Amino acid sequence: HGTIESRTVRLVVDFIEDFAIELPTLDDLTRISRVSARSLQIAFRRELGCTPSEYVRRVRLNRARAELLTPQPGTTTVSDVASTWGFYNPGRFAMLYRNQFGEQPSQTLARALGT
């Protein structure tokens, strides 16, 4: 059963990586994997040590960081990048970002801009 579980997780991970900009929900993930939310959560915990939702959040944060590290001078803002990746509460985005990367998103952007 581990190999089916592994294949299911791989399928869902690939989907998340390909469609992260569309902010996939747990319903989307269960639909493409054809397993229940509970089964998917168990498989993710076993294979990756996190839930599908946590994995989606991690991917979205990584994509936001990539944008902050390669800004368009004068046009890239932390709030625009955050909302692009589905983070609509600036304080929550800053907290999640700091927890994952050890710095504020504004620090990442300032460093990338050389300011």
Where are the predicted features?
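Alpha-helical DNA-contacting segments of helix-turn-helix folds
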Residues: 16, 23, 43, 47-63, ...
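DNA-binding recognition helix and immediately preceding turn/loop
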Residues: 2-51, 73-84
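Sequence-specific DNA-binding recognition helix
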Residues: 38, 44, 71-109
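C-terminal intrinsically disordered extensions
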Residues: 7-9, 112-115
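Short alpha-helical elements of helix-turn-helix
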Residues: 6-10, 58-62, 66, 90
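A general, composition-driven signal for non-globular sequence regions
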Residues: 32-35, 54, 59, 86, ...
